[in-house]
A protein has these predicted regions:
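N-terminal glycine-rich FAD/FM-binding segment characteristic of electron-transfer flavoproteins
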Residues: 1-196
């Protein structure tokens, strides 16, 4: 197991109670990030803020919670930086220069083990309620305040569905048919379906 510095980020409205609680969990550095109007979630502004911190800190592993925001931001960061990503992880183990993660697939019927090389930063999103948080000796993290403004071209990037254009179909889709006629091998030939 590798012992590394733990860095945390809080984006949006800053709650002093949250800062005090983080002191009990071994956080070495804490970035408090405010982005313009904090009660509005802007994916691009949040992404740019996280990328700014990544550039400053050069992390090996970037963890996101399994919340809706975490699931939205994790792939944005990975795609922007071309980092490896593993989602919905229930187990993480660092061994030498490899990261081993486990995650459920096929609606939880199978547990997949993924081995990732730590030659580039890795983005991980955690499955909710899969990890215990152990309190450690309280320490005073190095706190840095970061201010980012929402860029003008980031404020109105909500997609709006205006029209659905369906392709022309020569045959009716089975799911749209009002009557379905089925026959087995006993029909012998497609032309015999008119008997049914």
């Amino acid at each position: 197991e590798k012992k590394q510095e733990n860095i945390a980020m809080i984006i949006g409205e800053i709650n002093n109670n949250n800062i005090e609680r983080l002191k009990e969990y071994g956080i070495n550095s804490l970035f408090l990030c405010s982005i313009g109007t904090t009660n509005v979630y802007s994916p691009d502004s949040y992404r740019d803020t996280i990328l700014k911190i990544i550039k400053q800190t050069n992390p090996e592993i970037i963890l996101f919670s399994g919340t809706s925001l975490g699931k939205d931001l994790a792939p944005r960061i990975a795609a922007n930086k071309e980092y490896s990503i593993a989602t919905d992880c229930t187990s993480i183990s660092v061994k030498s220069e490899e990261l081993e993660v486990k995650r459920p697939i096929y609606a939880g019927k199978i547990i997949e083990t993924v081995i990732l090389k730590i030659n580039n930063p890795i983005v991980i999103s955690l499955k909710i309620n899969s990890f215990d948080i152990n309190k450690q000796s309280q320490n005073e993290p190095n706190i840095t305040k970061v201010e980012n403004e929402i860029k003008e071209n980031h404020t109105n990037q909500v997609p709006i569905l205006k029209e659905i254009i369906f392709p022309e179909k020569k045959t009716l889709d089975v799911s749209e048919a009002s009557i379905i006629v089925s026959g087995g091998r006993g029909m012998k030939d497609p032309k015999n379906f008119n008997i049914i």
